[in-house]
Amino acid sequence: MSAEKKQNLQDTFLNSVRKSKTPLTIFLVNGVKLQGVVSWFDNFCVLLRRDGQSQLVYKHAISTIMPAQPVQLYEPSADADD
């Protein structure tokens, strides 16, 4: 796999929940709980949307991200046995 096509787990996860509009609960390092849907992200922040309002959350402030439903990060290959 070439270097420009390789994506890290964080970007793969955030892109997946963004595309599927999966509701998330985000816990910050100070204990604050935020809920919403990811509408955009980059290397430093996440744009969370809820009830027509947007919140820009810096990634260094995030402790945990919990999706409301399971997230499939890859397509299982047809010849995979497990």
Curated annotation (Swiss-Prot):
InterPro entries hit by this protein? Hfq, LSM_dom_sf, Sm
Which superkingdom is the protein from? Bacteria
Source species, please? Caulobacter vibrioides (strain ATCC 19089 / CIP 103742 / CB 15) (Caulobacter crescentus)
State the PROSITE patterns in the record.
SM
Which BP terms from GO are recorded? regulation of DNA-templated transcription; regulation of RNA stability; regulation of translation, ncRNA-mediated
Main function: RNA chaperone that binds small regulatory RNA (sRNAs) and mRNAs to facilitate mRNA translational regulation in response to envelope stress, environmental stress and changes in metabolite concentrations. Also binds with high specificity to tRNAs.
What would you give as a GO molecular function for this chain, any one? RNA binding
Kindly state which keywords UniProt assigns to this record, in alphabetical order. RNA-binding, Stress response
User: NCBIfam families, per this entry?
Assistant: Hfq, PRK00395.1
This one is known as RNA-binding protein Hfq
Give start and end of each Sm domain: 11-71
Q: How does it assemble?
A: Homohexamer.
The UniProt family comment states: Belongs to the Hfq family.
Q: Which GO terms describe its cellular component?
A: cytosol
Q: Which CDD domains match?
A: Hfq
